[in-house]
Structure formats: C-alpha cells, structure tokens
C-alpha cells in the first residue's frame, strides 16, 4: 500500500484483559477520550460510532475482534468535510503480553498518500493513548484537554 500510516507503541503496566476492557467499554473510553462517547457491540460486522456533545464525529465497522489480542476497525471521519472526503481509514489495535505489562501497538492507515486525516490523527492519538496509559496505571488521565468541533 502506498498510502499514509501512523504507528504508536506503548507499554502499559496492566493485563491484556484489562487493556481490552478499556478499549471496548464505553464508560472507560469516555474517560480517556476527552468525554467522547462510543457505541458498538465490538463484534465483527457491527458498526461503531463516536460522539462529542451529541454530534457524530467518527464511525465505521468492526472488521476483526479477537479479545485481548486484536481489534480492527474501518474509520470514517464524519465532522470535517476534507477528512470525510478521503474515505475510510483502518485502525488496528494489537495487544501483546510482556511480563507484568501489555504492549499496545496502534496503526492507523489509509490508502491515500499525504492524507490530511492521518496527519490529524497522528497528533490526536498520542494524547488519547497517553490518557489511556495514565488512567490504567494511576486511575487518572494525564490530559484534560477537550477538542472542540473546530480543532
């Protein structure tokens, strides 16, 4: 694929089971995703939707779901016309046990060179995943920043 890709790897001192739960439980997601709510059954073929203040921000389909190991989703940005015009991207979460920790690898890609959307998520994912790591290890998020609709 000659497209655009963002990869982020972090190690979180938690079990793969608890990390999986954090990736797929709406109440937990809302804590580290700056108040955004997510709806999905997290089963292959099911849809997922993410909302900020009641407005649809992103949506897609669950393409793979292997508990505690791998979650693959199609991803369509719904709120910025220039991002939506790029079409569906693909977001992959891979979890590997590493001793007392879990290794989380996130890969967000699109089959489009120089994607503006991948450029934007490459700034957003580090904040989200830093919050996830902090929440799971300390019980509190690292950042309280909330993206507005114009960001």
Put a short name on every predicted segment:
Residues 7-8, 24-59, 146-151:
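Short beta-edge strand/loop motif at the mouth of beta-sheet-based domains
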Residues 80-127, 132:
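Beta-strand/loop substructures that line and gate deep hydrophobic ligand-binding cavities in soluble
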Residues 54-56, 64-71, 77-79:
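Short, charged/polar surface micro-motifs in flexible loops or helix N-caps
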Residues 19-20, 29, 48, 62, ...:
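Hydrophobic pocket/interface hotspot
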Residues 134-151:
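Short, highly charged C-terminal tails/helix-capping segments
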Residues 16-17, 63-70, 94-103:
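A short, structured loop/turn motif at beta-sheet edges
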């Amino acid at each position: 694929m000659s497209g655009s890709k963002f990869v982020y790897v972090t190690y979180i001192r938690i079990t793969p089971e608890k990390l999986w739960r954090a990736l797929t439980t709406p109440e937990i997601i809302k804590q580290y995703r700056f108040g955004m709510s997510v709806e999905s059954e997290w089963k292959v073929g099911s849809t997922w939707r993410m909302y900020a203040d009641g407005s649809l921000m992103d949506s897609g389909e669950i393409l793979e779901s292997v508990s505690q190991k791998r979650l693959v989703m199609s991803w369509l940005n719904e709120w910025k016309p220039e991002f939506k015009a790029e079409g569906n991207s693909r977001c992959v979460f891979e979890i590997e046990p590493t001793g007392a920790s879990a290794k989380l690898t996130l890969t967000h890609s699109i089959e489009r060179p120089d994607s503006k959307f991948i450029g934007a998520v490459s700034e957003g994912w580090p904040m989200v995943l830093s919050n996830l790591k902090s929440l799971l290890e300390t019980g509190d998020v690292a950042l309280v920043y909330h993206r507005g609709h114009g960001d």
